[in-house]
């Protein structure tokens, strides 16, 4: 109305947006009579009727409960695909970023860390911050000592190519990044003292600490190791197991620069 848009066109735009958002039956209701998800769709409708070239959404789901957040997230993603409008979506929830974004920009303290597709961020994180931020559960970040042939973690040497080690010639310790699903149970590998087992049917998550870790490591959640195991008979609390690692799935990070060098 303030833009001198004719009344008939205003009504048409409102009806089109309401139909798109599934709000036709709520046009005569006051905001206080709407649910949280419906109010969120009304806010989107206000933007749609302006025919924008770009949407900017700043934490749009932060006030919704978990179930409604998932439902609204899928609605926003479907709507964006239908409209084909470039959308800049700001969020602290990495699940929202990974599931909704075509490209994701990861920032820390206002500094851009990496811009890439969700899969590239997951598979090839640029540094320790991105590695620890993307993924749920997060990537395991394990400190180890540089030795001949790789990096020693506990009593096991994780194979690392010489050309990778040569990229950090002055460092005696490096950080290994390993996704929970990159582990499997075997006879040789990193020793794990199992503290908690989460059985999910076909899979199970093992939470524990490196075998031989001191008391401080056991109490420190940041030192915890998480492994996703495909087994209907997973190890139990208190057991010691060996986690086998495919060297091709190991990320190596410099502790001086925090950059990935593998």
Map each language-model feature to its residues:
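ABC ATPase nucleotide-binding domains
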Residues: 1-129
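Generic, ordered loop/turn and secondary-structure boundary motif
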Residues: 3, 27-28, 69, 99, ...
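Non-catalytic connector elements of ABC transporters
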Residues: 137-139, 150-262
């Amino acid at each position: 109305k303030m833009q001198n848009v004719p009344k008939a066109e205003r009504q048409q735009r409102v009806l089109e947006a309401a139909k798109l958002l599934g709000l036709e039956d709520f046009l005569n209701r006051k905001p206080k009579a709407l649910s949280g998800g419906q109010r969120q769709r009304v806010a989107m409708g206000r933007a749609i009727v302006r025919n924008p070239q770009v949407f900017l959404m700043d934490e749009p789901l932060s006030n919704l409960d978990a179930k409604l957040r998932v439902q609204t997230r899928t609605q926003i993603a479907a709507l964006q695909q239908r409209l084909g409008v470039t959308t800049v979506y700001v969020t602290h929830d990495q699940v929202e970023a990974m599931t909704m974004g075509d490209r994701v920009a990861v920032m820390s303290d206002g500094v851009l860390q990496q811009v890439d597709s969700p899969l590239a961020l997951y598979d090839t994180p640029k540094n320790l911050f991105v590695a620890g931020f993307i993924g749920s559960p997060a990537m395991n970040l394990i400190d180890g000592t540089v030795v001949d042939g790789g990096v020693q973690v506990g009593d096991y040497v994780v194979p690392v190519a010489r050309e990778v080690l040569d990229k950090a010639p002055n460092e005696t310790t490096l950080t290994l990044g390993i996704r929970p699903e990159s582990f499997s149970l075997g006879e040789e590998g990193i020793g794990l003292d199992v503290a908690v087992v989460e059985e999910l049917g076909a899979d199970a998550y093992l939470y524990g600490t490196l075998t031989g870790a001191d008391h401080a490591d056991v109490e420190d959640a940041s030192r915890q190791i998480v492994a996703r195991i495909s087994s209907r008979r997973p190890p139990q609390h208190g057991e010691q197991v060996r986690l086998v690692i495919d060297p091709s799935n190991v990320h190596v990070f410099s502790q001086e620069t925090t950059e990935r060098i593998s």
